[in-house]
């Protein structure tokens, strides 16, 4: 009798699953770019309204994402043009998967700068696309000539550009991204998962540029547990994407919470501003430590290069702080770690440990 594994695709058996860290109780979780606080914390009236709306949500009925009113709320909150259509996803990860499926014709190629979000390459492999990774420059800026040459040579059906980039935090220039869009015949996805921390967006161009999809999520602005992502683009493309999305891919509680949050976006925006201020404070303090290379970030995390990534990672973990060790993921990430911007107390704890490891006594004089 054949093993049941013999019926499973060989290429999938050869893959590794995405690793989610098991975080013990009491740890500061600074590895996944989550908000350090509940987005409604400190706003008792809003919390009460949220609880009442959750209690009234029709959880006995299948959700209708397209008729939920969430697209209209997103359009209003983020100035998405009327000419753009919006597709909702169970997190932007789901949309990355289905956009890949949408373009995965035999022989089609996907292009992305590297290092970047690992799920681009993963989905290319899953759906049989040729993957073209173009290395960034050593300072994590975009190697635009190399990208444009790869576009010319491989004619990718799908290109992903993370803006700002993950895991580096570095933001490519708007002119560079526009050049890639203009040079591409295929679809270009500008992945703005961290766009709220950048201050710039391609959302106003959604629906106006035929081959542009702008991808966003509510996860990084305090709602990672909701799993709500959205893609905005021209109706011709988004309409095709809608055909292959699962019919009930959102849930009633997430839809209810997201609509409420967008009606009170001023509170969410204030939380974002606080994190941006903490990011700049951390960047300034890390920059004072001469043995570190701290990369400028426009996201809610900071990437650093240290003399020994294993030593810092293990020391932080011994002190109940979990960050993301990037060392080994890509040659350009040698001895790099990614630190989510947490609460001021969490950030101070990280800074104190780094100072103990890497500051010389003369650094304090």
From Swiss-Prot:
EC number: 2.6.1.9
GO biological process terms held by the UniProt record: L-histidine biosynthetic process
Annotated metabolic or biological route of this protein: Amino-acid biosynthesis; L-histidine biosynthesis; L-histidine from 5-phospho-alpha-D-ribose 1-diphosphate: step 7/9
GO molecular function: histidinol-phosphate transaminase activity; pyridoxal phosphate binding
Source organism, top-level taxon: Bacteria
Extent of the signal sequence: none
InterPro entries xref list: Aminotransferase_I/II_large (IPR004839), HisP_aminotrans (IPR005861), PyrdxlP-dep_Trfase (IPR015424), PyrdxlP-dep_Trfase_major (IPR015421), PyrdxlP-dep_Trfase_small (IPR015422)
Catalytic activity: L-histidinol phosphate + 2-oxoglutarate = 3-(imidazol-4-yl)-2-oxopropyl phosphate + L-glutamate
Cofactor needs: pyridoxal 5'-phosphate
N6-(pyridoxal phosphate)lysine carried by residues: 220
Keywords: Amino-acid biosynthesis, Aminotransferase, Histidine biosynthesis, Pyridoxal phosphate, Transferase
PANTHER family in alphabetical order: HISTIDINOL-PHOSPHATE AMINOTRANSFERASE, HISTIDINOL-PHOSPHATE AMINOTRANSFERASE-RELATED
Family affiliation: Belongs to the class-II pyridoxal-phosphate-dependent aminotransferase family. Histidinol-phosphate aminotransferase subfamily.
HAMAP family attached to this UniProt entry: HisC_aminotrans_2 (MF_01023)
Subunit note: Homodimer.
Protein name: Histidinol-phosphate aminotransferase
Organism: Neisseria meningitidis serogroup B (strain ATCC BAA-335 / MC58)
